[in-house]
Structures are given as structure tokens and as C-alpha cells.
Amino acid sequence: MAEPLLVVGLGNPGANYARTRHNLGFVVADLLAARLGAKFKAHKRSGAEVATGRSAGRSLVLAKPRCYMNESGRQIGPLAKFYSVAPANIIVIHDDLDLEFGRIRLKIGGGEGGHNGLRSVVAALGTKDFQRVRIGIGRPPGRKDPAAFVLENFTPAERAEVPTICEQAADATELLIEQGMEPAQNRVHAW
């Protein structure tokens, strides 16, 4: 029997952050849970919200940390331990400043690219070698501070595209679960 997968959507808790660029991981996690017919519930040992289900014959644990982005690892580390999930079987879904708005890319490992949520996950897991679903939000205009940019709401034009982008990111995550990294990359990177 295949090991379970831990699929984590990164974001910040609370209504103030719900529509910000930094919360795309939460939106995609919610879509995946809805597709599985699963509901998020508090996980007492980690503090995260967790939903469970099955996809492609594998047990899935969907998670949304309920701490701020830069502390995400504090809840992901204990979840991985509780469910006995190795880093290679963890998928982290997150926004990415280094990708053009709306572009979706899959990869294993690599740097954090200034993403404090990823930095926290790497510190908690002790490795960079976990799977990632990267959702492009683009660079801030002009000299705007990237830290402020990721916490802003989308522009009206971007907001109109966000539902489609998040559905595509959920599709990409499902392909990754069903087919593995290389076949999923070949398909997703052609979109």
C-alpha cells in the first residue's frame, strides 16, 4: 500500500487575508477538499486544519496551517510526524513572486525564493526535498516592497482570473498525485 500524501496549502488565517496573493494555497486546498467531499477540521496535535480522503488509490491528508505564513513549519512538521509522511510525500501549494501571474509550475526541492512560509517548512522538515505546486503572482510594480505586495488583495482584473487559476492549480495537484512529478510536469508546464 502506498504511503499517504500530505498536501499543504500555505496562507494566513483570518478574513483580513482571505483574498490576498499570499493565500492562494488555502484557496486551492479548499478546492481539493471540495472535490474529495472532505471537510476541514482542527487537528489538535498540530493546530492546523486537516481534511482526509483518497485519490488515485492513496490516502490524502489536506492541511491548512492556522498560524501565520512565516510559522507554517511549526504545524506542518508535527503533521508529517503524526501521519508518518516522509518529506518526499509532502506537496506544498504556494504563491510565487518569481512566476508570471497565473503561471503554474511543479518542482521538487530548490530554494525558498524569499518565501518565508517555505523557509519555515524547510526548517521544520530539515530538507528542501518536498514537492511544490507554485502559483505565479508576478513581481510587485515599481519599487513596491514584495512583503507588502503579497499581503495585498488582487487587482480587479487579476481577481477575475483567480478562480480559473486556482482550479488549474487544483488540477495540477491532482495530476501530481495521480501521475507523479515528471509526467505531471510535462502536462502542466505545457499549459
Swiss-Prot record:
Upregulation: Constitutively expressed (at protein level).
Q: Which GO terms describe its molecular function?
A: peptidyl-tRNA hydrolase activity; tRNA binding
Task: Give site residues, Discriminates between blocked and unblocked aminoacyl-tRNA.
Answer: N12
SUPFAM superfamilies (UniProt xref)? Peptidyl-tRNA hydrolase-like
Where in or outside the cell it occurs: the entry states: Cytoplasm
- The EC number(s) given in the record are 3.1.1.29
Q: Where is this site: Stabilizes the basic form of H active site to accept a proton?
A: D95
Note the superkingdom of the native organism.
Bacteria
CDD domains, sorted = PTH (cd00462)
Describe the outcome of a gene knockout. Essential, it cannot be deleted. Depletion experiments lead to decreased growth. Depletion experiments lead to accumulation of peptidyl tRNAs, in particular all 3 peptidyl-prolyl-tRNA(Pro)s, a reduction in usable aminoacyl tRNA pools and hypersensitivity to macrolide antibiotics that target the 50S subunit.
Give the Gene3D superfamilies listed for this entry: Peptidyl-tRNA hydrolase (3.40.50.1470)
Enzymatic reactions: an N-acyl-L-alpha-aminoacyl-tRNA + H2O = an N-acyl-L-amino acid + a tRNA + H(+); N-acetylglycyl-tRNA(Gly) + H2O = N-acetylglycine + tRNA(Gly) + H(+)
Q: What's one GO BP annotation on this UniProt entry?
A: protein quality control for misfolded or incompletely synthesized proteins
PANTHER family on file: PEPTIDYL-TRNA HYDROLASE
Function in brief: Hydrolyzes ribosome-free peptidyl-tRNAs (with 1 or more amino acids incorporated), which drop off the ribosome during protein synthesis, or as a result of ribosome stalling. Catalyzes the release of premature peptidyl moieties from peptidyl-tRNA molecules trapped in stalled 50S ribosomal subunits, and thus maintains levels of free tRNAs and 50S ribosomes.
Quaternary context: Monomer.
Query: What is the name attached to this protein's record?
Result: Peptidyl-tRNA hydrolase
Gene source species:
Mycobacterium tuberculosis (strain ATCC 25618 / H37Rv)
